[in-house]
Design a protein with these regions (language model features):
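Acidic, polar-rich low-complexity tracts and alpha-helical solenoid repeat scaffolds
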Residues: 4-190
Length: 190
């Protein structure tokens, strides 16, 4: 337990330090050790300070990856997008575009829920493939798109099934009579 206190004390020392190089090296160290929460906390402070320096690209990419590795996919996608918009020809642009799409893919809900984020994920992955058609990650991106499209098809099926089930529901006589007169809306959903 002594190592834990030393570690916490060391982390607090890093947070309180005014030496940005020291903080950046500590953030890289935490990132390398898989301590993404600590890395992201430090990098959040540093990205504006490091803007315009040689460490700016790497710090923004590491911040995005820190959130990605913590499972905060929306924040990760935001920072990946910020990276590739700021550095369109940057060192990590291909990875940032790919991981932005993958982060949105991982954040999509189950088919019965609203699928707005699924459309965003498809769009982001298609943009990745447009910008990097020869990427070694192209096949993975295509598989994610197919998976997302399957999710949308399942959503449409569930919606159509719901309309069909409502149309054949016999508990409400006036509703059922109205459906017989006006027709079942099921076919309009297909």
């Amino acid at each position: 337990s002594g190592a834990f206190f030393t570690s916490c004390g060391e982390y607090n020392k890093v947070l309180k330090s005014g030496d940005y190089e020291y903080k950046y090296e500590a953030a890289k160290s935490y990132f390398g050790k898989g301590q993404y929460n600590k890395a992201s906390t430090i990098l959040e402070e540093l990205i504006t300070i490091l803007k315009g320096t040689e460490d700016a690209q790497e710090s923004l990419y590491m911040l995005a990856m820190s959130y990605y590795n913590q499972g905060d996919y929306i924040t990760a996608s935001h920072y990946f997008t910020s990276y590739y918009n700021t550095y369109p020809n940057g060192t990590y642009t291909e990875l940032a575009r790919f991981h932005s799409g993958k982060a949105l893919f991982l954040d999509t809900p189950e088919p019965r829920l609203d699928q707005s984020s699924t459309f965003s994920a498809i769009s982001e992955l298609q943009m990745f493939m447009e910008y990097f058609p020869e990427s070694k990650r192209k096949t993975e991106a295509q598989l994610m798109i197919f998976n997302l499209q399957d999710k949308l098809v399942e959503k449409d099926y569930l919606t159509a099934k719901l309309y069909y089930d409502l149309g054949t529901y016999t508990g409400n006589a006036s509703y059922t009579a109205d459906m017989r007169i006006n027709g079942n809306n099921f076919l309009a959903c297909i």
